[in-house]
């Protein structure tokens, strides 16, 4: 948002008011006309409240074109203007509990509600409470029950004709239900996009290499205001009705809650998260309950709305210039706010991911004080053009990690510095690498890096790797936090006395883990490679590497070209392997693991050709429980004999090995006439004898 003048101080009310009007009008134009909002809601609200207060303190400063005297933005070009039969007003906002109590008191006083000697209202006001959706307000006009026109709010008096686009919203009925419909009905409501639909839309945008939307509100607004309704038809928009403009040919319902019930009977979509309450206490209780479930709702809301329920009381209360006196929007703490970005550091995740983190001047947003926010990755920093020293928009929603949405370029200082991604890990000093076609840069010091220690140990110990039974996440947490284990090699130095002292670790558990560690020393090359936790190297690739090279040293010393010769190893996997073994820290840990008395496995020469036995090239399916072999052991034996172990039975299956409680796979094999073997038959086949 470009500035045309320096920001005047509060001591100059005339200049300050003019500046505030200019800032707000520019923000309105960007939001309503350009569809490019560039000022957070919280900042807009703050500037608006300041202008309101200035005009209250200095009535002579009020101008006819002040944003406080109007509802929204002007109609944009490209759509036919529509003059609303009844103005589409916005609502005054409340933020603190005190604002709600004051609102209730104003309403009660205006309605001359009775009070007791202590001044407490004995006849509390009845309110209808609803959600405040984060979308785009529209009006729907029905004549004799048939939908004829839709218009945006615009400036409250004149909006834009979006009839053809609204026709594509499937939740909006083109004809009202029931035999008795009004001659004219002007329905007020909100067009929005559900969270799941927003996620799917952005997936489609990415797949088509088109611009993604920042949030569901922007997506809904942009979709509704498409000049081509065919595009709108492809966008998953929804609608909720919540108000009324004009009603002819029928009496108006006596209460707002009755109006919404009537809408439902007409087939209009009405949100069910609503209630009728009494007094300020009821309002605040509704607000708290909605706040607790806010993040689990399938759509975005930014507050709740309170309306005096009785229609006759609404009429008595009337309106001010831009809003009804009988209603108030109670907004949640702002999810976006402005602050200064003072530095950008990098954080190393459990898997080695390097994430830029913004260090911020403290700002209260989303109900908490935020000093740090994620910048996701280097590409995001570049795309958003975020620099050190910028004034930035920070967003925090619920329990979601705060993020920097963007920078206000018009406020950028001359000395703002660009972010430079480090080349070495700030934790362990290992090289930082970024694979082709990946957004995330990573530390290559996997086994050595303290930031990755817990993840590396957990992966090393899992069943398909070294299979260290009893070494769970809670034990790993203690071992790392007490600095007893730095790398996987340190696991094999643990003694009974050390383990027995761990929290909630009995002597029997300690001995079981010692026994499990001793057993884990005898493994296979494939399991060991998989246990190293090399990025993109799964169980199958580890087996292919072990088969191809026969021993570990040739794998560690292999060039990318040599790695590419391995079955199913492509450029990304080869690059990942090469980077891992090129890091000296990783080689050191591997040598420690291979030291005398540590991990061993049978090594052999590289396989010059595929196995030539009766199982070579055959497809085998395992099902049920075998008497003496685990499924993993049977799978390893079959693969060593050149067979492929599949997960489902088909016409291409050569054998099915069935144990106890074999299920549908056995039935399918019998149906297709595929040979079925038990464990003895499997052993015969492995020995080269046809069972």
From Swiss-Prot:
Q: Which domain of life is it from?
A: Bacteria
Q: What is its EC number?
A: 6.5.1.2
The record's SMART domains line, in alphabetical order, gives:
BRCT, HhH1, LIGANc
Reply yes or no: does the keyword DNA repair apply. Answer: yes
Q: Which GO terms describe its cellular component?
A: cytosol
PANTHER family in UniProt = CHROMOSOME TRANSMISSION FIDELITY FACTOR 18, DNA LIGASE
Q: What name does this protein carry? A: DNA ligase
Species this protein is from: Burkholderia orbicola (strain MC0-3)
What lineage, starting at the top, does this entry show?
Answer: Bacteria, Pseudomonadati, Pseudomonadota, Betaproteobacteria, Burkholderiales
């Amino acid at each position: 948002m470009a500035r045309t003048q320096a920001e005047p101080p509060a001591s100059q009310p005339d200049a300050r008011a003019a500046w505030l009007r200019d800032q707000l009008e520019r923000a309105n134009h960007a939001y309503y006309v350009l569809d490019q909002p560039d000022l957070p809601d919280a900042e807009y609200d703050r500037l608006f409240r300041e202008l309101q207060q200035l005009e209250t303190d200095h009535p002579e400063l009020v101008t006819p074109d002040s944003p406080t005297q109007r509802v929204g933005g002007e109609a944009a070009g490209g759509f036919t203007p529509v003059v609303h039969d009844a103005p589409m007003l916005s609502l005054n906002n409340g933020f603190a509990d005190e604002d709600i109590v004051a609102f209730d008191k104003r309403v009660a006083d205006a309605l001359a509600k009775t009070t007791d000697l202590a001044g407490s209202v004995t006849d509390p006001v009845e309110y209808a409470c609803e959600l405040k959706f984060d979308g785009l307000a529209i009006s729907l006009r029905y004549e004799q029950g048939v939908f004829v026109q839709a218009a945006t709010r615009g400036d409250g008096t004149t909006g834009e004709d979006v009839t053809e686009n609204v026709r594509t919203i499937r939740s909006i009925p083109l004809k009202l239900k029931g035999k008795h419909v009004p001659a004219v009905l002007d329905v007020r409501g909100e067009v929005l996009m559900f969270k799941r639909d927003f996620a799917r839309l952005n997936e489609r945008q990415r797949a088509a290499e088109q611009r993604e939307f920042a949030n569901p509100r922007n997506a809904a607004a942009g979709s509704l205001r498409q000049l081509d309704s065919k595009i709108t038809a492809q966008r998953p928009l929804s609608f909720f009705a919540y108000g009324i403009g004009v009603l002819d040919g029928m009496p108006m319902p006596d209460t707002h809650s009755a109006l919404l019930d009537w809408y439902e009977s007409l087939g209009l979509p009405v949100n069910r998260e609503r209630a009728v309450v009494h007094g300020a206490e009821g309002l605040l209780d509704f607000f708290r309950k909605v706040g607790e479930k806010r993040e689990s709702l399938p759509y975005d809301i930014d507050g709740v709305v309170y309306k005096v329920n009785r229609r006759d009381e609404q009429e008595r209360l009337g309106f001010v210039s831009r809003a009804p006196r009988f209603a108030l929007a109670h907004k949640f703490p702002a999810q976006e706010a402005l602050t200064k970005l003072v530095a950008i550091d990098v954080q190393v995740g459990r898997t080695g991911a390097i994430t830029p983190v913004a260090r911020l001047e403290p700002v209260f947003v989303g109900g908490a004080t935020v000093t740090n926010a994620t910048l996701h990755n280097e590409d995001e920093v570049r795309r958003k053009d975020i620099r050190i020293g910028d004034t930035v928009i920070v967003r925090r929603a619920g329990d979601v990690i705060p993020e920097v949405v963007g920078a206000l370029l018009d406020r950028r200082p001359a000395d703002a510095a660009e972010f430079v991604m480090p080349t070495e890990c700030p934790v362990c000093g290992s090289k930082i690498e970024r694979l082709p076609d990946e957004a995330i840069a990573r530390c290559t010091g996997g086994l050595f890096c303290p930031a990755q220690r817990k993840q590396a140990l957990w992966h090393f110990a899992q069943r398909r790797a070294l299979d260290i039974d009893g070494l769970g996440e809670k034990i790993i947490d203690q071992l790392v936090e007490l600095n007893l284990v730095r790398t996987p090699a340190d696991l094999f130095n643990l003694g009974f006395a050390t383990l027995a002292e761990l929290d909630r670790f009995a002597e029997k558990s300690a001995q079981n883990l010692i026994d499990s560690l001793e057993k884990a020393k005898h493994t296979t090359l494939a399991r060991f490679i998989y246990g190293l936790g090399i990025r993109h190297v799964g169980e199958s690739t580890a087996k292919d590497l072990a088969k191809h090279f026969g021993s570990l040293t040739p794998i560690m010393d292999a060039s990318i070209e040599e790695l590419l010769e391995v079955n199913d190893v492509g450029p990304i996997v080869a690059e990942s392997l090469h980077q891992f073994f090129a890091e000296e820290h990783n080689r050191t840990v591997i040598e420690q693991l291979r030291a005398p008395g540590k991990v061993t496995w049978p090594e052999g020469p590289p396989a010059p050709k595929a196995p030539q036995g009766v199982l070579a090239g055959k497809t085998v399916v395992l099902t049920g429980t075998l008497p003496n072999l685990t499924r993993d052991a049977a799978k390893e034996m079959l693969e060593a004999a050149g067979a492929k172990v599949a997960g489902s039975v088909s016409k291409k299956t050569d054998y099915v090995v069935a144990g106890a409680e074999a299920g549908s796979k056995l039935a399918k094999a019998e149906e297709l006439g595929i040979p079925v073997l038990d464990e003895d038959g499997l052993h015969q086949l492995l020995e080269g004898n046809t069972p």
